[in-house]
């Protein structure tokens, strides 16, 4: 068992949030730099965490952190700094601000041609210059109307982005590696819409069962198949005389903050007799958990009821996101944070759980697909500013983050965490050499 003989079980958890993954990536880059100060330039995040859990964009980060960097001749895992660069390089391609829509252009041309044929069949093509000029003015308006109809059709029936660039990037970063081949244990949730059930992709499960051993590419595309934004993902695993079909949507609909899910999965792995398969029976002194959020806009009152009669369109169409998903994911995230804070504090081991999150994003920053360079830079700045803010926990009465008295800054907490991770790794290396 992967956790046997260890003084601490170390867990890293990364929320979903699209381009807002820059925020946790920035914090991870700082953590890795501190680890490198202690253990050398070759230190990588994957060397220090027994389990890395991630949802959606956090799942992509998880997969990269636990995969060899194809540009590294020594096959070391991706560095956190390189993952931060990945967001700046690829976000504009995955989430283009003005996505090309060749199907829309073809459809408009076809419809315009049909209108032209109809006019000809009616024998009303103007022969005089004045009539032809009127027709020339009519077609731009017609094209505008067609454009509106086609855009509305695509909004209702198609994802906002075609996902082709995401597939290319995932293939480039993780190659043909399978889930059982990650460099540390990963836990990546998704949701099967056919079974209406959360699917947890796990390295340890994959090592035991071929039907759990999905290609890492499919895992990434499953956990990041955000409703409305990207296509769903369907794939199949075949084994000897067995097969399994997956019909997947973004893991954020079930566990946008995967920390609690990760602890639950670890509890199952650590249980030999079934007695410890719930958190109540776990000794939290044996866990060291870092949970990284991608930000929320709670303080900016993003949603407000002006008209009480919200139909399907109001729930699905907001200025900077999907109100239904925003409410669902924020509610789940809040409950996970509240439960885990109480769990570790109640056992007087609050230093074993560090959650870094902001609830002050504005309307521009909260968009998961806002790949504008200025916004990406703002998100990186937010990550750096978070390091200087005090360690915080959610206030149960207000639902807002409140500084924990005497806990210091997130920077100081990360530096302290780096030392504990380094000491734990050195202890294990010394133990394995004797």
Predicted regions and their residues:
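Conserved catalytic cores and adjacent C-terminal regulatory segments
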Residues: 1-434
């Amino acid at each position: 068992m992967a956790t046997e003989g260890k003084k601490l079980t170390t867990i890293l958890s990364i929320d979903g949030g699209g381009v807002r993954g820059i925020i946790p990536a920035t914090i991870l880059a700082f953590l890795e730099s501190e680890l490198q100060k202690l253990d050398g330039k070759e230190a990588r995040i994957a060397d220090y965490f027994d389990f890395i859990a991630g949802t959606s964009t956090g799942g992509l980060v998880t997969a990269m952190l636990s995969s060899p960097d194809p540009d590294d001749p020594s096959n070391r895992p991706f560095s956190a700094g390189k993952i931060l660069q990945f967001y700046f390089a690829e976000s504009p391609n995955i989430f283009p601000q003005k996505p090309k829509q060749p199907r829309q252009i073809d459809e408009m041309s076809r419809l315009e041609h049909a209108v032209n044929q109809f006019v000809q069949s009616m024998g009303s093509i103007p022969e005089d210059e004045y009539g032809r000029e009127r027709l020339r003015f009519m077609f731009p308006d017609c094209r505008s109307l067609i454009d509106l109809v086609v855009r509305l059709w695509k909004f209702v029936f198609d994802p906002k982005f075609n996902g082709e660039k995401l597939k290319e990037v995932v293939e480039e970063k993780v190659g043909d590696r399978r889930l059982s081949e990650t460099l540390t244990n990963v836990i990546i949730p998704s949701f099967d819409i056919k079974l209406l059930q959360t699917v947890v992709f796990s390295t340890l499960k994959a090592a035991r069962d071929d039907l759990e051993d999905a290609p890492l590419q499919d895992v990434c595309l499953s956990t990041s198949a955000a409703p409305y934004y990207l296509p769903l993902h369907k794939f199949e695993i075949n084994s000897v005389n067995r097969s399994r079909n997956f019909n997947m949507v973004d893991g954020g609909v079930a566990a946008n903050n995967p920390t609690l899910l990760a602890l639950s999965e670890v509890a199952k792995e650590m249980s030999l007799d079934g007695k410890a398969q719930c958190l109540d029976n776990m000794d939290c002194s044996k866990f060291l958990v870092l949970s990284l959020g991608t930000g929320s806009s709670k303080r900016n009152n993003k949603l407000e009821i002006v008209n009480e009669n919200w139909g399907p369109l109001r729930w699905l169409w907001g200025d900077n996101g999907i109100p239904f998903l925003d409410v669902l994911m924020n509610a789940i995230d809040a409950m996970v944070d509240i439960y885990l804070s109480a769990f570790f504090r109640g056992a007087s081991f609050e230093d074993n759980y560090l959650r870094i999150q902001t609830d002050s994003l504005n309307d521009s920053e909260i968009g998961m697909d806002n790949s504008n360079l200025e916004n990406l830079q703002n998100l990186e700045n937010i990550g750096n500013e978070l390091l200087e803010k005090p360690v915080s926990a959610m206030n149960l009465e207000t639902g807002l983050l409140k500084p924990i008295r005497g806990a210091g800054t997130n920077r100081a907490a990360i530096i302290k965490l780096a030392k504990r991770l380094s000491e734990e790794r050195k202890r294990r290396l010394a133990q394995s050499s004797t």
